[in-house]
Regions:
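Surface-exposed interaction/ligand-binding surfaces
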Residues: 1-204
Length: 204
């Protein structure tokens, strides 16, 4: 049971056994992940690997990998992934050399729906000025000058570094005297998303 805005990893795998072979396949229905912020992890090339499922040997292909951040609490549904496959199966016929002739057929397979119960963030110990960050972060305020002359400018950078929902919250606004002329901050992000979630830094 994840918390609101806590990363969830979803991996769709296709299992099959000999003598069945998969010669072609494509997604005919991709999950939309409603109520989640989602990021698909790139799979450069589908490859078949050996695996064990319920004590039996199988071939397996990792078809889709996604990282999700729930944007609502309560019961949320992960939609299924549907694949259209071209399957090769040995027939009872044999070729000139005595090898079994493969027979092709088309099949559609669908992963089942999954429900996830998303918990509300704890209220106990929640800061008054909480701005939505969920994860493990370091927060720094960087000032480029230690002393100032009249009418001289200075720069403050707010920087958050770590692992968590970095792209899903705003940095806190500085409370400054009205006598200072304040310019709009330049926002920058250096964030990568892997199966373990977002990692990197953001700054204003």
């Amino acid at each position: 049971r994840p918390y609101l805005n806590e990363a969830i990893t979803v991996v769709y795998k296709l299992y099959f056994r000999n003598p069945l072979r998969i010669s072609d396949g494509r997604a005919v229905e991709n999950p939309q992940f409603a109520d989640f912020w989602s990021h698909n992890i790139d799979i450069p090339r589908l490859k078949v690997e050996n695996a064990t499922y319920k004590g039996e040997p199988y071939s397996v292909v990792v078809w889709k990998k996604s990282v999700l951040y729930p944007q609502k609490t309560g019961k949320l549904t992960l939609e299924p992934l549907s694949l259209s496959l071209v399957i090769d199966l040995p027939s009872n016929r044999r070729d000139f050399f005595g090898n079994r002739i493969l027979q092709q057929s088309s099949r559609t397979v669908t992963a089942g729906r999954r429900n996830i119960n998303v918990k509300t963030l704890p209220e106990k110990g929640k800061p008054v000025n909480f701005f939505g960050a969920v994860g493990q972060f370091n927060f720094d305020a960087l000032i480029n000058k230690n002393s100032l002359k009249a009418s001289e400018s200075f720069e403050i950078k707010l920087k958050v570094t770590g692992n968590g929902n970095l792209k899903l919250f705003n940095l806190p606004e500085l409370v400054l005297p009205n006598t200072l002329e304040v310019f709009e901050p330049e926002h920058s992000e250096n964030v990568k998303t892997t199966l373990s979630g977002m990692q990197g830094n953001i700054e204003d």
